[in-house]
């Protein structure tokens, strides 16, 4: 598949896409022995691409782990045939090929992990993985006893589900802020739970997953995980 050179270089882990554009401007990239220009494309399957004379194929793959604070309005896919904004666009400059670990629906926001570490992805999304996911959910509707009703659910719209841990953090005149901890990754699970309990979700934000917490990472921004955070994810212990 033919792609822009800066995208190929970034995915190979050499540098960010913007830095790759600078390499092209400086004449440090070649394709099949010929100096490449910014705007050129190539096919990794057919062409020999080199940076500073060293073939990309000869470089070991770089494994990165990225935490994104996904904004509302972005779908959790690598590309979208409907032309919608994707979360992958926001981490395109991370310097390596990555995939989202699990999903957040378009109108949800918060912590979303990206990596190309297949073993870790499988661990975190496997139904038997017992991975806790913590959400802050603003709701309105039948507020009295809402936390208790949600905690008591054992099926969601006819589908068996594990018990969630729910507590009320704040109550306003017309809405309430709940903390919801679930242990599964079923499609739109919390929204379906709330609907079943007579609640409308106004905002849904994932603030923690497994050993990771969102912290003060700004909406739309991403950061690399630290070595300690990666180790904790793999071992299942707090960093």
Q: What would you call each of these model-derived segments?
A:
Residues 2-239:
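Basic, flexible Lys/Arg- and Gly-enriched helix-loop patches that mediate nucleic-acid binding at interfaces
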């Amino acid at each position: 598949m033919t792609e822009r050179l800066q995208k190929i270089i970034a995915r190979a882990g050499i540098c960010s896409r913007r830095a790759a554009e600078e390499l092209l401007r400086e004449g440090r990239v070649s394709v099949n022995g010929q100096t490449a220009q910014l705007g050129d494309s190539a096919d990794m399957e057919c062409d020999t691409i080199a940076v500073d004379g060293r073939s990309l194929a000869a470089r070991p793959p770089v494994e990165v782990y990225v935490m994104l604070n996904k904004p509302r309005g972005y779908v959790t896919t690598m590309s979208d045939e409907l032309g919608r904004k994707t979360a992958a666009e926001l981490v395109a400059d991370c310097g390596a090929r990555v995939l989202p670990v699990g999903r957040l629906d378009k109108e949800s926001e918060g912590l979303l992990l990206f990596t190309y570490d297949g073993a870790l992805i499988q661990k975190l999304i496997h139904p038997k993985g017992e991975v806790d996911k913590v959400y802050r959910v603003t709701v309105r509707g039948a507020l009295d006893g809402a936390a208790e009703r949600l905690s008591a659910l054992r099926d969601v719209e006819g589908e068996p589900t594990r018990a969630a841990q729910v507590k009320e953090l704040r109550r306003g005149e017309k809405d309430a802020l709940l903390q919801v901890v679930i242990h599964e990754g079923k499609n739109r699970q919390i929204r379906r739970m709330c609907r079943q309990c007579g609640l409308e979700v106004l905002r849904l934000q994932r603030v923690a997953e497994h050993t990771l917490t969102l912290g003060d990472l700004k909406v739309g921004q991403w950061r690399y995980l630290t070595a300690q955070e990666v180790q904790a994810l793999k071992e299942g212990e707090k960093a």
